[in-house]
């Protein structure tokens, strides 16, 4: 069974792509107050503006209202993935190939969890 975040991803991703955005990540916090957090990036490399976030938020809100996945009231937060974004999809690694990254591991590797360069 899919989580709420996965279900939301499935129903909004195509619409965001059509709008020119990559859906980077969806998080759902199911405790009161419930929060749907959506991180986006531009497919064409442009910076994400507040207007972009507003338009995406309106689109997602309309879709979620129709699909009725979340019982009770919730807050919807849409933002840019930012410069320190987490790479969560395989395609992201190719997109940022050749750029400097800081890698933070969950487990020790050679006695370290942080590799700044």
Curated annotation (Swiss-Prot):
Main location per the UniProt record: cytoplasm
Extent of the signal sequence: none
GO CC terms, sorted: cytosol
Keywords associated with the record: Cytoplasm, Ribosome biogenesis
Pfam families assigned to the protein according to its UniProt record, in alphabetical order: RimP_N (PF02576)
Listed GO biological process terms: ribosomal small subunit assembly; translation
SUPFAM superfamilies noted in UniProt: YhbC-like, N-terminal domain (SSF75420)
Subcellular location: Cytoplasm
Source domain of life: Bacteria
UniProt-listed InterPro entries: Ribosome_maturation_RimP, RimP_N, RimP_N_sf
Gene3D superfamilies in UniProt: RimP-like superfamily, N-terminal
PANTHER family cross-referenced by the UniProt entry: RIBOSOME MATURATION FACTOR RIMP
Function: Required for maturation of 30S ribosomal subunits.
Protein family membership: Belongs to the RimP family.
Protein name, as recorded: Ribosome maturation factor RimP
Organism: Rickettsia prowazekii (strain Madrid E)
């Amino acid at each position: 069974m899919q989580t709420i975040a996965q279900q939301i991803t499935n129903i909004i991703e195509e619409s965001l792509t059509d709008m020119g955005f990559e859906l980077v990540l969806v998080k759902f916090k199911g405790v009161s107050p419930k929060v749907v957090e959506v991180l986006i990036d531009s497919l064409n490399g442009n910076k994400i503006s507040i207007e972009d976030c507003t338009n995406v938020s309106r689109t997602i809100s309309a879709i979620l209202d129709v699909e009725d996945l979340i019982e009770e009231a919730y807050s919807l937060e849409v933002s840019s993935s930012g410069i320190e974004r987490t790479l969560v999809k395989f395609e992201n690694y190719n997109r940022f190939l050749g750029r400097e990254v800081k890698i933070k591991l969950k487990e020790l590797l050679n006695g370290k969890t942080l590799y700044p360069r």
